[in-house]
Structure formats: structure tokens, C-alpha cells
Amino acid sequence: MRREFCWDAYSKAAGSRASSPLPRQDRDSFCHQMSFCLTELHLWSLKNTLHIADRDIGIYQYYDKKDPPATEHGNLEKKQKLAESRDYPWTLKNRRPEKLRDSLKELEELMQNSRCVLSKWKNKYVCQLLFGSGVLVSLSLSGPQLEKVVIDRSLVGKLISDTISDALLTDSFIILSFLAQNKLCFIQFTKKMESSDVNKRLEKLSALDYKIFYYEIPGPINKTTERHLAINCVHDRVVCWWPLVNDDAWPWAPISSEKDRANLLLLGYAQGRLEVLSSVRTEWDPLDVRFGTKQPYQVFTVEHSVSVDKEPMADSCIYECIRNKIQCVSVTRIPLKSKAISCCRNVTEDKLILGCEDSSLILYETHRRVTLLAQTELLPSLISCHPSGAILLVGSNQGELQIFDMALSPINIQLLAEDRLPRETLQFSKLFDASSSLVQMQWIAPQVVSQKGEGSDIYDLLFLRFERGPLGVLLFKLGVFTRGQLGLIDIIFQYIHCDEIYEAINILSSMNWDTLGHQCFISMSAIVNHLLRQKLTPEREAQLETSLGTFYAPTRPLLDSTILEYRDQISKYARRFFHHLLRYQRFEKAFLLAVDVGARDLFMDIHYLALDKGELALAEVARKRASDIDAESITSGVELLGPLDRGDMLNEAFIGLSLAPQGEDSFPDNLPPSCPTHRHILQQRILNGSSNRQIIDRRNELEKDICSGFLMTNTCNAEDGELREDGREQEIRDGGSLKMIHFGLV
């Protein structure tokens, strides 16, 4: 098998790529090969109407012995041998008591005739499906294959309505909401599961001795409304929410009270009872409401809003549950080009991704307060972030799929095949006949995933659910070199392997040194080491500056503990960059870097090399600067540090510098037509107080006079666009940011 298929998640492949927020020179498209994701599609279906081609070795379904499918090329037997050699079942067994084949047929018939209102993964092995009629289906997996299907009809005919809107499933209780009823159904289990292997064993509700209770809730009367439910991680708080109802009062209708106008309810669960604690009316129509994973009593909402100019926006709000009351404590307004139709947060909840009606994709970073914009090749009605926070998948109801990294660089994808043909999108409609739309796309993973990068859990299965079937998973072939992992470091290393340095730097720039310091250092070291091994060009020089600038000139000031932990190690890379500049006689940039570092030995290196090259004026300036540093150290009584002991000086050089004033930010009217997928980076700043900030130049007047004769400073190109956040975020302080002037970073 070819090397591309046995490498890690991203293999080398040719293709086009979206423009980067960093300036880039034209590349040789003939020899340049790019990363892509290699996948397999496993459909849990026995239907012979899917019409999967027998030559598609990347798509699998189950077959019936009694009804062999018609083959197009006569390769079905070879495909069967390939599947069985990989321990993929070709036909399902029907042994008692599971009777897997009959259970799957019953499930497919149920999906054709009933609406699935909820699908929840309890863990990596068990999925629960709840249908509007009250049927509860449990699926057990072994890898990408079905192992067991249990259909439970215990609730059928025992509920006040068969139009279930949403549901919450826990090990202790079930909560149901209804489309046309202002009531919540609370089903409490009086008996716990007696199983040594809770992950695998599937129990029916009848074995748990349940009791059913109903609770009245406020809300619109005599109206069919989608009432959604969410629960926190400790299972003691629940929110029930629905879209805003028009406030227009009818002449014969009574005036609604505040309680009846509310569309967000806070409920408490304690001692086997459910109680409505408080209610509130959101300012705008909510798109998504969920509890935070880190703070169990915080509620995150995304609401549709409009600006003063009637332009669409999205409000990212934080509500807190304080003394059984829910109240809004923070609002961040994100301008959009069109209305948002989908959203998703990453596991660490510091990034919000929005899909819009114009096929644009917006990513807002809470830490940097930066907004990224990309154009997708589909209508982003579904978004799902990988548990590692490295990639996100965007899907459409038409069955299209596209992958982006967390810096919004697109990643090509292809199914396992004989030929290497990666594409921007994966179109399921061209692979099999699906009679309904794609309605769910979810990574198979627990609710809370560790972000330390030390876990051994592998998350390589994406659950797919079409409205009337089939069900299935998309298996990502992650390979042995990454040990099945798909993290930020793994993607950056693969980008470096394919010489996609801009994409690697963009991911590094999106990472937070304060929370992911170890991963940031490994990634930055890999990028800088790769660039220092190559010939210095203006492009690579800018890449080195940007990579080191993620630590030395971050968008937000780093914590002191972070600086102290990594400054000594990173200063060695800064010194290597200095000598790399000298090696290629980049005296101007090397001198400015030496000024920032403030190390005597660096100026002496410039002095001796300038003498060898006949640059007498520069040699004299460097020698004088080294003498000044000697004099300053003697005057202050500080002993001169050795060449490798000045790691803190590069940081100290930036103390006192602050952000330049930002002008009025606006969304760019037109996207650049350079690639099929367009991309911008839009810097957002929330300014409390005066917007006029002054840049304090650290250089003294003597340096200005000396350097003006022979040094020429280069400035970076401005970023593609800027966008001021119309913010009401309360917790953000008015502070400056470390900024490097001589280093060539804006």
C-alpha cells in the first residue's frame, strides 16, 4: 500500500489552498504537496438501495446472505475479502439473545417512520437514540462496527404526548419536553444499574423501576414550540429554552406577565425532585444554550442580534446561576456578514465558531479577542469540533463535509481508495443514495476531554445521522506515527513535513501560551528548527519573526509564570536567529535584534563580522554599543551574564510598550478572489476608555542618530482587515500588550 495511506492523519497530496493571513510568495504548485485527511465510511445499514459501488474500498455497509447485491464491475468478492481481512463484518449474525441483524432492520424501519429527537453518546462505546414516540434505542460499538442494538419500548403509550421535543438522559433520571405541552416529564429511576461493565451493558428501563412525574412550566400557550433542554456536568441544574415569541398583543388577549414572556428557565434537581428556580427573557432570539464544562453554574448562549445599522450580529452571552437566580453577566457582540445558522464551541470554551447563511465561517477567540473569517464550499448547517481542539468539521444538510484546522485553514479530505485524489469537500450524495438530509455530525467522545495532550484516548470516529437513515461513522485513519492522536502538535508537525509553514504558524498563533505552554513550546521549537536549517529568504525571515513573536510579542500579555518558565529556553532560539541573520549578512535586522536582547556578546559578533566585510561604520557602532553595555553593568553593579544566560533580557526589552491606536474597524466588503476558499484575519480590540494610545519608543536618541546613517527598518504589511468588537464584555481589563518594534512585528 502506498505511503500516503499508512502515514498519519495528514498525508502528502497536491491541491490548492486558501490564502493565509500572513503574506506569502508564490509557490511551485507542481512540486508542492499538501496535507489531507484519509478516511473510511462505515454505514450501519442492511438496505440494498444505497448503491455503493463495489470498487469503493473506502465505504462499507452490511449485506444480507439471502439477497446478494447486484455488482457493477464484479469486484464485490474482492471487496469482501478486503473487509474480512480487516475484521470488518460483511454480514451480521442473528444469534440469540441479541439477534443483531433483526434488531438493525427494526431500527432502520423505526427511523423511516418516526422522528429521532435525541442521540447521545454516554461514552465511546454506547449511543442512545430517543424517538418522538418514546422508543429508546441503545447502540453498542466495537470500533466502527455495531456490536449490539437494544430497542426499548417501555415508555410507548405512557406519556401525555407522543410529540417529544427534546430530552435529557442520565443514569438517574430522564427529562422530556414536548412540542405542544407546557410541561416537563420527569422520569426517575428507583433502581440503579447493577453492572460491572456499565460502558458495555445495555439495560432496559423496565429493569430500573422508574416513576413518571409532570411539572408545569411557563411559556407560550397553545403554540407548538421547540423546547430545548440542557443540563450541567453535576446534574443539579437544568435549563429549558425556546425561541422568542412575538410580543404583539391581540386586542382580546390578556397582557402577558414577565414570567410568561420568559424563554429561558432555570430548574434545580435535588432529592429526587425537579423545581423551577427562576426564569428570564433573553434580549435576542437564542441560537444555542448550554452549560459550561468548567463552571457548572455558568450558561453560555449564542443569540441572533442586529447592530444599530440593522446589520446581523451574534451575541455571545454568559449567564450565571447565583442564589437560584439566572442573570446575564457578560455579552460579546460579533459582527457578521449574514445571519448565523449554526454554532459550536471547542472543548476549552475559548473559541466560538459560527456558520452563516452566506457560507462564511466565523471563529472568535476569547483569549486574543480576534475574529477569523473563512469561506466554505457548502452551507454550514452543522459544525463539530474535534475533542483535541485541533480541527473542526463543517457539514451541510445535503450531505457535504469540509475540514478546517483551528486557524481556519482548509484541509483536503478523501476516502480510502486506490488513487490519491484529495478534495476540498466529501460529498456523500455521490457515494451512496441517501433519501434524507444529514441532520447530525458528532465526534464520539465523552463530554469532558483532557486538554493536556497526555491522554492515550483516541478519538477517530465521527458519528453521522441522516434524518431517515442510515446511521454510520466516518473513521479517520490517523496512522501509527501519531499513535492515533489528532492534536495540535500532530497537525503542526505534519504541516512542517509538507512544508506548509504558514499554516503551522497560524495554528501556533492561535494557541494560548498560558494554558498550552508545553504544546506551544514544542510547536514553536519545531517550526524554528525547521526554518533555521534552510537558506534564509525574506519569506523565511518573516516566518521566524512571527514564530518567535508568539512568545515575545503576544496579542495579550503572558502571565509572569509563563514567561519565567519558557524565557530561558526560547532566548536560545532568538540567539540562533541572530546568528542566522549574521550568516546571511542581514546586519540591519541582526543589529535591531541585538538592541532588543541587550547582550554585549551579540554586538561584538556584529563588530568582528562587520570588520571582515569592510562595514567599518557598523563595526564601530556595534563596538560602542558593547562598551555602553559594559559601562552600564559596572555603574549598576550588575555582573555581566554569559551568552546563554540572558534569556530574560529579550522580554525586558519590551516593558513599557503598548498597543498602537486602532482605527475604525469594518468588515471587508469583498473577499480576495485568489483561491476557492477566502480567508481574512480580523483583529478585535475591546477598549475601555480613550482609544488613543501612544507608542513609547525604547531607543534613546543616541541610537537614533547612529543608526540613521546605515540602517533601514522594514515594516510588515498591514493585516487584511480589522474589526472593532462592539463589546459589553465586563471582565476585560484595559491593559497594554507586549510589543516588539525592532523585531519587525506589527
UniProtKB/Swiss-Prot annotation:
One GO CC annotation, please?
A: cilium
Q: Which cell locations does it reside in?
A: Cell membrane; Cytoplasm, Cytoskeleton, Cilium axoneme; Cytoplasm, Cytoskeleton, Cilium basal body
Per the UniProt entry, the effect of S708F is: No effect on the assembly of the CPLANE complex; increased binding to phosphoinositides
**Major location, coarse class?**
membrane
Q: Name one GO biological process term.
A: septin cytoskeleton organization
Q: Which domain of life is it from?
A: Eukaryota
Q: Has the keyword Ligase been applied to this entry? A: no
Q: Which GO terms describe its molecular function?
A: phosphatidylinositol binding
Listed InterPro entries = Frtz, WD40/YVTN_repeat-like_dom_sf, WD40_repeat_dom_sf
Q: Where are the WD repeats?
A: 326-374, 375-414
| Keywords in alphabetical order | Bardet-Biedl syndrome, Cell membrane, Cell projection, Ciliopathy, Cilium, Cilium biogenesis/degradation, Cytoplasm, Cytoskeleton, Disease variant, Intellectual disability, Membrane, Obesity, Repeat, WD repeat
Its annotated function is as follows:
Probable effector of the planar cell polarity signaling pathway which regulates the septin cytoskeleton in both ciliogenesis and collective cell movements. Together with FUZ and WDPCP proposed to function as core component of the CPLANE (ciliogenesis and planar polarity effectors) complex involved in the recruitment of peripheral IFT-A proteins to basal bodies. Binds phosphatidylinositol 3-phosphate with highest affinity, followed by phosphatidylinositol 4-phosphate and phosphatidylinositol 5-phosphate.
Assembly with partners or alone: Component of the CPLANE (ciliogenesis and planar polarity effectors) complex, composed of INTU, FUZ and WDPCP. Interacts with CPLANE1.
Q: Which disease is it linked to?
A: Bardet-Biedl syndrome 15: A syndrome characterized by usually severe pigmentary retinopathy, early-onset obesity, polydactyly, hypogenitalism, renal malformation and intellectual disability. Secondary features include diabetes mellitus, hypertension and congenital heart disease. Bardet-Biedl syndrome inheritance is autosomal recessive, but three mutated alleles (two at one locus, and a third at a second locus) may be required for clinical manifestation of some forms of the disease.
Protein name listed in UniProt:
WD repeat-containing and planar cell polarity effector protein fritz homolog
Q: What is the lineage of its organism?
A: Eukaryota, Metazoa, Chordata, Craniata, Vertebrata
